[in-house]
Structure formats: structure tokens, C-alpha cells
From Swiss-Prot:
Phosphorylated. This is Large ribosomal subunit protein P2-B. InterPro entries: P1/P2_N_sf, Ribosomal_P1/P2, Ribosomal_P1/P2_euk, Ribosomal_P2. Residues 89-112 are annotated as: Disordered. P1 and P2 exist as dimers at the large ribosomal subunit. One of its GO terms (biological process) is cytoplasmic translational elongation. One of its GO terms (molecular function) is structural constituent of ribosome.
Length: 112
């Protein structure tokens, strides 16, 4: 599924309770997005009969399932590196990253 069509569908649903493919296509074209009719048809068939709130809830449930299943794998991979003495390299990288983040302010100082 393409997120651009889902975003256009969500935007169109603010105006109509059940927007159609033509509504989604009109929004995409207004934004300068090229519409692939096959992909749009697939998305519209996949979300038929569901509200935007239902789609968001289903997506959030799927994302939390992915995050939970991926977290232990990342933790297991980091443990051998720390045991092998690889902890010094991330500390140096963190210091450099913090230094780069300070430069991102670009002199605006809005919250200083």
C-alpha cells in the first residue's frame, strides 16, 4: 500500500464520509503527485468499508507488534559488542552527534 494514497484518502474523508478513488486522485494531482491507477485501485479495495479511525487503529496495532518483535533482536545483537569492549566507540560517536546537533540551531535561538 502506498502512504500517499492513504494520506489523500484521510484528507478527502474530512469532506466526505466515504471518499472514492476520484476524490483521492484529485487530491494527489492537486499536490503534483503522479497517480498509478493500479496502486490506487488496490488501496481503495483494501480500505473499502473502513473509516479512517479504524485504519489508524489497525495500523497502530500492527506497528506496535512490529516494534515489540524487533526490540529483542536489537538488544541481543548489542550484548556481544559490549562484552567485546565495543562500548568506547559508541561513546565517541555520541559526543560527535551532540556536537552536530548544536550546529543545527542555525542561529535562530527561538527557545534560548
Amino acid at each position: 500500500m502506498s502512504m500517499k494514497y492513504l494520506a489523500a484518502y484521510a484528507l478527502a474523508s474530512l469532506n466526505k464520509p466515504t471518499p472514492g478513488a476520484a476524490d483521492v486522485e484529485a487530491i494527489c494531482k492537486a499536490c503534483g503527485i503522479e497517480v498509478e491507477s493500479d496502486a490506487l485501485s488496490f488501496v481503495m479495495e483494501s480500505i473499502a468499508g473502513r473509516s479512517v479511525a479504524t485504519l489508524v487503529a489497525e495500523g497502530a496495532a500492527k506497528m506496535s507488534a512490529v516494534a515489540v518483535s524487533a526490540a529483542p533482536a536489537a538488544g541481543d545483537a548489542a550484548a556481544p559488542a559490549a562484552a567485546a569492549g565495543g562500548a568506547a566507540a559508541p561513546a565517541a560517536a555520541d559526543a560527535k552527534k551532540e556536537e552536530e546537533e548544536e550546529d543545527d540551531d542555525m542561529g535562530f535561538g527561538l527557545f534560548d
